[in-house]
Amino acid sequence: MKKTNKNYYTDEVNNILIDLGYNPCQNKEEMDDILKENNIKIKIFKTEEVLPNSAKIPNSYMYFATCGEDDFSEDFTEYITFCEAYNAAILESLSYLWLTKNRKNG
């Protein structure tokens, strides 16, 4: 994931925001408003909190995200930083939203 110099969100996240008709986000408050508007909920956990007896990478993160009634959970990828997990969760949720909207329109 390539992080922009301007803000917290990756280029991939900002590109999909543009495709969805939003401006790229400059801060967490803007993103929170977009997530709330689209009924997206994201939770980030330390891997060892979710899978305490696993051989997972220590101090890594996992995400759980929902978009409406659809649930996304990342069981196989471990993100080394909170920021990586957060961007991955947002990207997956917004990608799903984009696919849903384009399926209805196309």
Q: Model-derived features: where do they sit?
A:
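N-terminal segment of the canonical double-stranded RNA-binding domain
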Residues: K2-C83, L91, L99-R103
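Catalytic phosphate/metal-binding cores of nucleic-acid and nucleotide-processing enzymes, i.e., regions
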Residues: Y86
